[in-house]
Structure formats: structure tokens, C-alpha cells
């Protein structure tokens, strides 16, 4: 904690695979900038002190169990235990306040250390290489994780990758192309505008608990250094290796050797991966004519029968224009901002002030601001509802000109009926999830037993809903053997999750997996029904 320690730096091949030589030099300069900082030792010391205080305050289950045990020995002990507990709780309250102060200062120091390390890198390579790398790394991380997730889902088929890093590169470039991200130096040139394309929020809350500054803050600091340069280097960093592909294959084997396969493994060639990736994207996306309008929005609930009486002229390009898509994400951002402000008001987030649309507000102003935002949100939603009405009328007019027997009204009504049923299923998931939150907390034994008795009725409804999902023809290809087996075990009887003094972990895991799979399947079921409607509409064009 105080004496010097050996400084090790691990560089991931996935990182090397996503940057140029100059960008890698900037990243390494940033890391070595940390090594040169005297504040690193102070930060390490504060971190360890902080960790000790945290364990004293929050990781003390054995102490709580000891107190409960002493209180249960005899009634004569109860009074003394209660008095002692009140004194200890007061001391803990003081320590918690001290912990908050130490932690906030440590986090602030940590953020400053990041800025200083960025400045070190900028002095060595100029700012631009580090800016480009920082902006691209989230795409690189997403691409690498997606490739790994693909094989996690393919475990029953015993597929393994020959070279997961080539798959990472393919996904990264493919995503850049479909999102119209330009290329520079053979790599996607990601910008802040592209990252925040769908973020229309005007709310800015400085997170005093964050250990790293935000990406936007880091880039603004780097740009202010006035040493940005042209992107002269176009050489991929992985060319620094004598045989990068051999290294990638060796590391890929090490990654997949950790997995136990039931049968003989099958190496999945890159061409097959590319084909399956594109098929999966197509399966889980809506037709391109919608321009992303429905990606995070569902058609508004309408009485479409009345809308058949008036048919107007509209253009597809207007109904799904970039302006209409922006309107969708503006409404979503308003809704998120309102929810965040309400959490601040409820003291979920501890802040004294915040910025909204360039103006500083205090916590006491939240209710007034929320009321204004709700009016604005209602206005945006009305605009979107009107656009949905126009969309329906547009496709209805096309259908009437092409088909003798129109079906669009039936498709919409079926979708709206299903939506109402799906909302009930989702509510059931939320209800049970909230009801079992206590298993994550320290809870007295008698309260645990009482809480489990309260969820019996909810579980009964959940099991009914699971049976319906198992019989849904549209979901048969989505229900894996492992999921079906766990469902059937869960449905087989009424399970007990807690004994006298401990949880039955196997039973709990089974129930939590059933609940998680239920949520996945109702989401998938909703997507299937929504896509049926949208595909029918698109097919009319």
C-alpha cells in the first residue's frame, strides 16, 4: 500500500486490432503517464483505506448474524443487544459520512489523474491520435463482445472461432458501413456526433462518484491543448507483430479452451460467421424503408376503424424522414430526463445542482422543470401519434389500390390486442422482480419467510404465463433445450426457497433463470408480432 510495487501493463489484442500504430503509441503514453504521476501512490493509498472502511460498514454479514444469534439466546439479552446496536449504528452513521467524503475526493483525484495522463499522451503524439482511439474503442469493444456472445449462444452446436479477432474486425467495419461512419486510415472514423446520434438529452449532471471523466469532457480537454494534427499514420498497430494472425489464433484457442463442450468441437470459418451475423441482423431488425423510426418506438395505439374514413396523400420519405426519427429520440430523451430528475428529487442521486439546456438549476427547481418537460413531452408524443395516423393512412391507401381484400386494419387490431396482453405479462415480470429484491439485502429470517409467502400468488400467475409461452408456435425456435428443461422443472411443483436460517440456492437459481428467460421470451414474442405488422406494411410498397 505504501512501498513501491511492480508496474505491469497488459495490452489486449482486441485493442491492438482496432487502432493504428500512432494511436497505440498514444494509448501507451497515456498509461505510462499514470506511472509517472506522484498522485498514483496517493490514489492507491486512499483506495485501500476506502476499501477497508467499506468492508467495515457494508460487508459485515457475519457480525449481523452474531447479533441476531445473541438476541435469540435469551430475552434478558435483547435489551443490552438493542442498546449496543443503537450505539454501533450511530458510529456507523458517522463512518458512512466520512466514507462519502473520502470517496468523493478520491474519485475527483482519479478523474484529474486521467486528464493528466491524456495530456502526457497529447504531448508525445499530439491530441488527434488519442481522440480517434477513444472514440473508436467503444465500437471495438462492442464488436469483440458480440463475437464472443455469438459463440456463447452457439454452445449447444459446439461451434468455436478460428480467429475471434478477425471476426471483431469484420463486425466493427460492417457496423460502421451500415451506420454511415466514414473510414480513415483503414479504420472507422467514429465521431462524438455519431456516438450521440440518438441522444437528444439536454440534461447534464456531473457525476461526482465517477472514477473516470466522461468521453466528451476528455475530448474537449484534448482539443483545448491546441496540438491536434493530421492523421498521418495509416499503419495498423497489429503489423508490429511478426505474425499477428498466428498470435490471434493462439489467443483464440486459449479463450475457447476454457469452455467444456459436450461433443466434438466444430471450427466456424470466417465466411460462415459473416453469413450468420448478417442473417441475425436481418432477423432482428425492421425493414430499411422505416429508417430506424420503429427501432425504439412502437406504433401508437389507435382506433384504426375510424381512420379509414379519411385518406390523404403522404410521401414515404416524409413519414420516415430524419426529422421524424429525431422526433422519436427527442421524446425518448425527454422521458429519460424526467425520470432522472424524479430520481434526483427522491434522493436516489445525491446532487445539489445540474444543468438543463445550458442553464443551471438547483434541486429545489426540479418540480417546476419536470412540469415544463411533461408539457413538452406531451406535445412531442402528439406529433408522433399524428405521424402514426398518417403512416396508417398511407399504407391503407396503397393496400386499397392493390388488393381486393384489405388486411391492414386486421393486422393493426391484432397487434393492438396483443400489445395489451403483452403489457400484462411485462407487469407480472416487474412485480415479481420487485418482490424478490430483498434477497439482495440483509433481511431478518422471519421477514424472509414472510416475503416468500407473499410471492406465492405472483408465482402462480407467472407459471400460467410460462405455460402459454411454451405452447406459442412462434416461439418454438427461440426456446432452447436448456430453457425448456428449466421451465419444466420450475413448473413441476411449488418450490421452497428458504429454510430456517439459509436460502436454498439451487431452487433460487432455477426460479431466477425461469424469470429471466420469461422476460427474454415475452420481449421476443412482442418483437415477432410487431415485425409481422411492419413486414406486411413494407410488403405493400
Regions found by a protein language model. Give the residues of each.
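Active-site metal-coordination segments of metallo-dependent hydrolases
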Residues: 18, 39, 43-47, 101-123, ...
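Peri-catalytic and regulatory segments of divalent metal-dependent proteins
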Residues: 1-44, 48
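Short secondary-structure boundary/capping segments
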Residues: 29, 41-45, 52, 147-155
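A broad, structural surface signal
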Residues: 25-29, 33-37, 54, 96, ...
Amino acid at each position: 500500500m505504501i512501498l513501491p510495487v511492480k508496474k505491469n501493463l497488459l495490452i489486449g489484442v482486441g485493442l491492438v486490432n482496432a487502432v493504428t500504430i500512432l494511436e497505440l503509441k498514444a494509448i501507451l503514453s497515456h498509461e505510462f503517464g499514470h506511472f509517472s504521476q506522484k498522485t498514483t501512490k496517493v490514489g492507491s493509498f486512499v483506495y485501500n483505506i476506502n476499501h477497508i472502511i467499506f468492508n467495515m460498514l457494508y460487508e459485515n454479514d457475519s457480525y449481523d448474524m452474531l447479533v441476531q444469534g445473541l438476541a435469540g439466546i435469551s430475552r434478558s439479552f435483547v435489551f443490552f443487544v438493542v442498546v449496543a446496536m443503537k450505539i454501533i449504528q450511530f458510529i456507523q452513521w458517522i463512518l458512512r459520512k466520512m466514507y462519502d467524503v473520502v470517496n468523493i475526493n478520491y474519485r475527483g483525484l482519479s478523474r484529474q489523474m486521467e486528464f493528466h495522463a491524456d495530456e502526457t499522451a497529447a504531448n508525445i503524439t499530439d491530441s488527434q491520435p488519442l481522440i480517434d482511439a477513444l472514440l473508436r474503442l467503444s465500437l471495438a469493444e462492442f464488436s469483440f463482445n458480440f463475437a464472443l456472445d455469438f459463440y456463447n449462444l452457439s454452445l449447444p452446436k459446439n461451434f468455436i472461432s478460428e480467429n475471434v479477432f478477425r471476426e471483431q474486425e469484420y463486425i466493427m467495419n460492417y457496423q460502421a458501413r451500415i451506420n454511415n461512419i466514414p473510414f480513415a486510415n483503414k479504420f472507422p472514423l467514429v465521431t462524438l456526433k455519431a456516438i450521440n446520434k440518438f441522444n437528444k438529452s439536454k440534461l447534464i449532471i456531473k457525476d461526482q462518484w465517477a472514477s473516470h471523466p466522461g468521453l466528451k469532457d476528455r475530448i474537449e480537454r484534448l482539443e483545448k491543448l491546441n496540438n491536434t494534427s493530421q492523421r498521418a499514420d495509416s499503419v495498423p498497430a497489429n503489423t508490429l507483430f511478426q505474425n499477428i494472425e498466428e498470435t490471434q489464433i493462439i489467443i483464440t484457442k486459449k479463450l475457447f479452451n476454457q469452455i467444456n463442450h459436450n461433443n466434438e468441437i466444430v471450427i466456424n470459418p470466417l465466411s460462415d460467421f459473416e453469413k450468420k451475423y448478417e442473417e441475425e441482423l436481418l432477423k432482428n431488425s425492421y425493414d430499411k424503408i422505416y429508417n430506424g423510426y420503429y427501432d425504439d418506438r412502437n406504433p401508437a395505439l389507435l382506433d384504426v376503424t375510424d381512420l379509414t374514413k379519411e385518406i390523404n396523400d403522404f410521401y414515404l420519405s416524409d413519414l420516415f424522414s430524419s426529422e421524424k426519427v429525431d422526433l422519436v429520440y427527442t421524446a425518448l430523451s425527454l422521458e429519460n430526463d424526467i425520470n432522472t430528475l424524479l430520481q434526483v428529487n427522491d434522493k436516489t442521486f445525491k446532487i445539489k445542482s445540474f444543468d438543463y439546456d445550458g442553464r443551471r438549476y438547483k434541486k429545489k427547481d426540479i418540480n417546476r422543470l419536470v412540469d415544463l418537460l411533461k408539457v413538452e413531452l406531451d406535445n412531442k408524443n402528439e406529433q408522433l401519434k399524428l405521424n402514426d395516423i398518417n403512416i396508417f393512412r398511407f399504407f391503407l391507401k396503397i393496400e386499397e389500390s392493390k388488393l381486393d381484400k384489405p388486411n391492414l386494419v386486421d393486422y393493426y387490431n391484432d397487434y393492438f390486442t396483443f400489445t395489451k396482453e403483452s403489457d400484462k405479462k411485462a407487469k407480472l415480470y416487474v412485480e415479481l422482480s420487485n418482490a424478490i429484491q430483498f434477497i439482495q439485502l440483509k433481511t431478518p429470517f422471519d421477514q424472509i419467510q414472510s416475503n416468500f409467502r407473499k410471492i406465492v400468488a405472483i408465482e402462480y400467475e407467472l407459471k400460467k404465463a410460462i405455460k402459454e409461452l411454451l405452447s406459442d408456435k412462434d416461439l418454438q425456435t427461440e426456446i432452447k433445450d436448456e430453457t425448456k428443461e428449466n421451465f419444466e422443472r420450475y413448473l413441476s411443483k411449488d418450490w421452497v426457497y428458504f429454510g430456517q436460517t439459509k436460502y436454498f440456492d439451487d431452487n433460487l437459481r432455477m426460479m431466477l433463470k425461469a424469470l429471466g428467460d420469461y422476460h427474454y421470451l415475452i420481449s421476443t414474442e412482442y418483437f415477432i408480432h410487431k415485425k409481422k405488422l411492419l413486414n406486411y406494411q413494407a410488403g405493400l410498397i
